[in-house]
């Protein structure tokens, strides 16, 4: 997510590295779809190459916009294509972010102009779009969503939980503790979803 602070980005990357270890041990395919700026991008298409994914993850930047609806849409498309190829049966989409989107889907898709600098999108419209996208993802056969919430505020917006609920997925708050706790949480959560 582009809206994560640097310290939470390190925690998110720690969670992602734990997931890479789990994927390697399970011989799972993985894909990396960062969402920042105006659009999400498939940085690493489905692969078993942990080394490539780790290298791309290490150099991944954060900041700028958070086109979360586009990221979920890209994850759905990438996962469905992998299913159609016959290489993948079950798809677990792991979304690491705070749930706060600030880029409308039509801007990400290029069907609308980016917002003028200083202009903010309608928050309720963004939330509705995000919830609808999560519901669509959750309705795809063989798909499940794991939402790892990086929000680091005293008063939480609860958006990440709403996304997980809309997709009928699982939700976990990313711990503020150490990498071992993050690794334990992420590996346990993914293991439970694959069972």
For the regions a language model picked out, list residue spans one by one.
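Solvent-exposed alpha-helical segments within well-ordered globular domains of core cellular machineries
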Residues: 10, 14-21, 51-58, 69-77, ...
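Von Willebrand factor
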Residues: 1-46, 70-74, 78, 89-96, ...
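A glycine-rich helix N-cap at a beta->alpha junction
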Residues: 61-64
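Von Willebrand factor type A / integrin I
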Residues: 77-90, 103, 107-195
């Amino acid at each position: 997510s582009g809206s994560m602070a640097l310290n939470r980005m390190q925690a998110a990357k720690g969670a992602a590295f734990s997931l890479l270890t789990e994927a390697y041990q399970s011989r799972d395919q993985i894909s990396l779809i960062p969402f920042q700026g105006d659009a999400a991008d498939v940085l690493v298409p489905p692969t078993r190459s942990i080394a490539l994914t780790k290298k791309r993850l290490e150099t991944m930047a954060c900041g700028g916009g958070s086109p979360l609806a586009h990221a979920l849409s890209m994850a759905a498309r990438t996962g469905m294509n992998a299913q159609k190829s016959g290489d993948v049966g079950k798809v677990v989409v792991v979304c690491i972010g705070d749930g706060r989107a600030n880029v409308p889907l039509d801007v990400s898709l290029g069907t609308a102009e980016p917002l003028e600098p200083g202009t903010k999108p309608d928050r309720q419209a963004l939330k509705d779009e995000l919830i609808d996208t999560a519901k669509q993802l959750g309705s795809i056969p063989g798909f499940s969503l794991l939402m790892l919430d990086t929000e680091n505020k005293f008063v939480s917006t609860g958006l990440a939980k709403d996304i997980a609920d809309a997709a009928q997925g699982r939700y976990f708050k990313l711990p503020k503790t150490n990498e071992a706790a993050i690794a334990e949480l992420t590996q346990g959560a993914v293991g439970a979803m694959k069972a």
